[in-house]
Regions:
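Long helical/loop segments within the catalytic core of UDP-sugar-dependent glycosyltransferases
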Residues: 61, 223-233
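Non-catalytic, topology-defining segments of multipass membrane proteins
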Residues: 1-62, 93-188, 247-336
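Long, highly hydrophobic alpha-helical transmembrane signal-anchor segments
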Residues: 47-92
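Transmembrane alpha-helical segments that form the membrane-embedded catalytic/substrate-channel core
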Residues: 60-70, 99, 103, 188-212
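Histidine-centered catalytic micro-motifs
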Residues: 66-76, 103-115, 202-208, 229-245
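Residue-level signal for cytosolic alpha-helical hairpin/rod architecture
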Residues: 88-89, 197, 235
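Juxtamembrane helix-capping/reentrant segments at transmembrane boundaries
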Residues: 78-98, 116-131, 213-226
Length: 336
């Protein structure tokens, strides 16, 4: 009978949804498209007399796209070729005013310490003040990177060269009188995109910032339109459970593992329908200050499948491989 044949049903992510693809995959194509859009925006402003709002909007779209690219590149799932993966990671970082090694190392710490007020760098980004100011708090990543001494090998040099490039651009803008363009058509779009990234990558997926259990420290809020607009970040829990899944496979991975998530009691809504939750959100928009109290350790599955020592000391590629090797343990069997 069908019931007997399905008595033991493994719930795992299909292998074809995991791992970095090669050749012209969606992430690489999106990076190239973002670069092309930004070049058109610059040429449209300086050479073709396009409307300011058109150039501004194009830059916002380009920066929004590379926000997902740098995220996948930090997990080594932007491209199977490590050189290409690093190249588009550094390119995206330059467009966003980030440093790729800083973003990657700090992001790995976030994965190891989700919702830990002391060790999760994104916890401060999300809860360190009003939500409308969240973009500026991304600069805390750099403070965290140096305070924890997270760099390895040539990453300090990479950081220096990236910051030197930004400084050289600003200096050139001052010398040739286009600093106003830099502010209005780069810094302001960065603030807009930073707000969106902070909201959809950090704040909404992890609120109310209390759960440490790996199955409950993030959430999903399924919606096919949002999946396109924010490139899968409404399935953020899927990313935390299986970091080797590229962004464009979050949604199919969610539906493939929905029974597993149900069995684990995972959060599968935005979590703002209750009156109390809604007013907490309003508070965070305008004020967002929290006072953290020491809590006793919780006997839960921890958020860190690998040790902090490995994350802070190992080469980035090894950290990604460690994450991938441990993902196979996250499936369960449901018995009738």
């Amino acid at each position: 009978m069908d019931t007997m044949s399905e008595a033991v049903k493994p719930l795992t992510v299909p292998k074809e949804l995991m791992g970095p693809p090669g050749q012209f995959n969606p992430t690489l194509l999106m990076f190239l498209a973002a670069v092309a859009i930004e070049i058109l925006s610059i040429l449209g402003y300086w050479c073709w007399e396009w409307l300011d709002w058109c150039c501004f909007t194009m830059t916002v779209i380009a920066l929004h796209m590379v926000g997902t690219v740098i995220h996948d590149a930090s997990h080594n799932v932007a491209h199977r070729n490590r050189i290409i993966n690093a190249a588009i990671g550094h390119g995206s970082a330059l467009m966003l005013g980030f440093s790729f090694p800083v973003f990657t190392r700090v992001h790995m710490q976030h994965h190891a310490n989700v919702n830990d007020p002391d060790n999760d760098p994104d916890h401060f980004v999300s809860t360190g003040g009003p939500l409308w100011f969240i973009a500026a708090r991304f600069m805390y990543h750099e403070i965290f990177f140096f305070r924890r001494q997270l760099w390895r090998k040539y990453e300090l040099l990479e950081w220096f060269l990236g910051r030197l490039a930004v400084a050289a651009l600003i200096y050139t803008a001052c010398q040739h009188d286009f600093l106003g363009y830099i502010f209005n058509f780069w810094f302001v779009p960065l603030a807009v995109v930073g707000l969106a990234l902070g909201l959809f990558f950090d704040y909404l997926p992890h609120r109310p910032f209390q759960e440490r259990d790996r199955w409950k420290n993030a959430r999903v809020y399924p919606n096919r339109i949002l999946n396109l607009l924010i490139m899968g970040q409404n399935y953020h829990l899927i990313h935390h459970l299986w970091p080797s899944i590229p962004w464009y496979n979050y949604q199919p991975a969610y539906y493939a593992t929905q029974l597993l998530l149900d069995a684990k009691g995972c959060h599968q809504s935005l979590g703002l329908s209750e009156t109390k939750d809604f007013w907490h959100f309003v508070y965070d928009v305008f004020l967002g200050i929290r006072w953290h109290r020491p809590r006793s350790p919780e006997p839960l599955e921890t958020t860190a499948p690998i040790s902090q020592a490995l994350i802070s000391q190992a080469p980035i590629s090894q950290v990604s491989q460690a994450h991938s090797s441990l993902e196979v343990t996250q499936g369960v069997e449901v018995r009738s």
